[in-house]
UniProtKB/Swiss-Prot annotation:
Biological source species: Drosophila melanogaster
Family the UniProt entry places it in: Belongs to the COG8 family.
PANTHER family: CONSERVED OLIGOMERIC GOLGI COMPLEX COMPONENT 8, CONSERVED OLIGOMERIC GOLGI COMPLEX SUBUNIT 8
Organism placement in taxonomy: Eukaryota, Metazoa, Ecdysozoa, Arthropoda, Hexapoda
Name under which the protein is recorded: Conserved oligomeric Golgi complex subunit 8
Subunit structure: Component of the conserved oligomeric Golgi complex which is composed of eight different subunits and is required for normal Golgi morphology and localization.
Localization per record: Golgi apparatus membrane
Topological type in the membrane: Peripheral membrane protein
Amino acid sequence: MDFPDKMDLENERVLKLIFPDGVPDNLRGNPELDNYLAKLGTCKVEQLKKEQTRLAEEARTILEQTQDLAISNYRTFITTAENSRSIFSEFLRSEQQLDTLVSKLPDLSVQCERFLQDSAELNEQRRLNSITLQKNAQLLEVLELPQLMERCIREGRYEEALELAAYATRLGQHQGHIPVVTSIVRSVEALWHNMLVQLVAQLRTDLQLPKCLQIVGYLRRMQAFGDNELRLKFLQARDAWLTSCLEAIPTADAQQHLSKTIEITRINLFNIITQYRAIFPEDEGTLKTQSSLRPLQGVSCNGDRLFQAWLHNKISDFLQTLERDLQLGVGSVETVLGQCMYFGLSFSRVGADFRALMAPIFVGVIRRRFESSVEQVDEQFERELERFTLINKVALHSHARKQVDPEQESYAPPEALLDFYPLAALCNGYLSALNELRLCAPLALATDVTRCLQHSLQQAAQRVLAFYRQEQQAFAGSEREAFVRLCSCLAYDLVPYIQRCIHGVFPPQSLTVHLGISLLQLEQQQLTYLQQTRILEPLKHLLPTKALVQPQDKVMEAKPSAGVPVTAEG
């Protein structure tokens, strides 16, 4: 059934009848209009006829009531109107304020967000401050790490200092983004470097092996140097200490300086070698295997070679000091030689026997000292010969030269030299030089000593000849005879005696054993034998005719330590 639609259609028809010009706007959609139309639909015809009159009457009544109400409530209406106007004004002002508020709401939102952020930060800071207050003791320990480490280093507690440095390193790895932690780590690193310098500086002092082991152990734990670098640092530091000890020795007295240098170098250098080998032990088998498998790759810093080079350098420095002090002059070369040989022998225990390197130095020094002594003897002989005179020279000693039994041969100088003071002074000078040489006479100098004396005797003969040429015009018979005796004493007393003294210092038997030749070969090669012919060549026309008797081979074999003088019978 379509009743609702049909009713709507009827209502529209009724409305057209009531409002031919259309329904007023104020009644459109009014539910009372619909209710009134529904009520009209229920009225009878008589009621419909009276409805218009009723409505007019009702309208008139309502109008009267409204007028009465307006008259009775006039003031109320005025007040209401004023209030309405006031309310309207307030609403307008409120609308303006709301518009202003709406325009400022974004800024307010931003400020609120900022306030919330600041509040959150303040809250976080307050929370951190609370945690800081609770963890105050632990934070103080962290903040005092640099001071604590500095105190440990100052007091020598390096074990604790290393633990603090390791803790600071771990702290920096985990909390490195915190500025305070970064500052603490930097301070600890600076103190770590100071400790490294202090440990290396301690190696430059007098240390025993346990202390050296401890210090190098700390350096290894610090991992500041590689193995070869650590070896180099150790040798440099110990070398600086050894050098300071040597530089502290007074240099005024060469003998004392050299003795102290030998003692200090021997003791301290041996200690350094012992310390090095204890700290850096070498596995020879491993080293040989590595060296055999490793190809050549340019220059490398091998620890063992580094130590050998350093030891070679120290020995070279000692040899330079030895040579310099010996050249300055020492009182007792044999004492220094004994100390040096003991020094070199003691180092054979560590495979560094360097006695062979000292031998040429001593040989050279002894040779120069002997040559210097002989030169002084030559100068003295020249001065004495210039003051010498043959006037009233009487032979006080016999000039007969006896055949001496080799078994009872003596090294006493010939008494005939006493008649001629220059020859006696020359002989005494030779004896002084040979006696000084005898205390420390290297076999390597046998030829040099013989050559030096040969040259000196040749110069003596030349000076005697010059003396003859200068004075011969004024010679009387007795003076000429005295000069012949002087020449004979030089040729047949002094020269054979010096030859015997040479063999006393350098026994032929010792030379034959050293050279691996026989006595006959030694004589044939003229080793340690003076060449009398060359010595006496300038004076041969002034010497009396003598028959020379050479020693027999059996005599030389019976007494190799005796000289083989060139003697003359009669």
